[in-house]
Amino acid sequence: MTLLNNYEYKIPKIWFHEIKGVQDVATLKELEIANQLSRHRANIFLESRAYVRQCLGTLFNLNPLEVPIIANPGEPPELPKGMGYCSFSHCNVAIILVWHENKIGIDIERLDRDFNYAKLAKKYFFKSNSLNTKGESYKNSILNQWCAVEAAIKWDHGKLAEDIKNCLLYTSPSPRDRG
């Protein structure tokens, strides 16, 4: 097994995969967990774990089934001490995975995601009074803020439902907002 002190690259590694129904790499434990989930959630669970195992297997020069990761649903993934940290996120069309020697978090959302961005912004985020709160750029700004907050919570190994109330996101004003 290649541990970090023998690993040449100390920068984060990021992988992006389209969701294609690939579920060919799963441990017995992961199959047991999948059997307890709805069909849709089981498919997402198995495919995301397959990609995570394939990517980390390549990184550490291991058979994907030998990657010693624990990645239970709704919990942060864990690697043994000395193997760094990983975080991953998925939407209905893609999965993104990041690995680094230090704690790290990542989130992905579709730009065309249908959500009540005005309500989300009002509840969780600060905004400039000079911004147009009805446009597509405002919606994208809120989605970017959401990704940043969710990635930070993952970095801290927290739980979104419990920890979002503790997050405050401050953004730099745009040149237009500075006057």
Predicted regions: what they are:
Residues 1-172, 176:
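Core catalytic alpha/beta fold that binds nucleotide/phospho-ligands
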